[in-house]
Amino acid sequence: MPQKFEQMQSAEQKHDEDETIAQAGTQIDDTVDALDAVLDDIESVLESNAEEYVGSFVQKGGE
């Protein structure tokens, strides 16, 4: 009898672990999508006017 309880408990723990892993996977996918969006924005700015963008970070004559 105690063995059955341990097996049931183990199955429940595995199910909980599977749910946690699935949730973590979803969060990772969301984070990757957000990062991709930021990188796409940066790429579009650089494609449209890279010289002006880079020039805004360059110091001029002792500034």
Curated annotation (Swiss-Prot):
It comes from Bifidobacterium adolescentis (strain ATCC 15703 / DSM 20083 / NCTC 11814 / E194a). Residues 1-11 have a biased composition (Polar residues). The N-terminal unstructured half of Pup provides a signal required to initiate unfolding and degradation by the proteasome but is not needed for pupylation, while the C-terminal helical half of Pup interacts with ARC to target proteins to the proteasome. Residues 19-57 are annotated as: ARC ATPase binding. The keyword tRNA processing does not apply. There is a cross-link at E63 (Isoglutamyl lysine isopeptide (Glu-Lys) (interchain with K-? in acceptor proteins)). This is Prokaryotic ubiquitin-like protein Pup. Protein modifier that is covalently attached to lysine residues of substrate proteins, thereby targeting them for proteasomal degradation. The tagging system is termed pupylation.
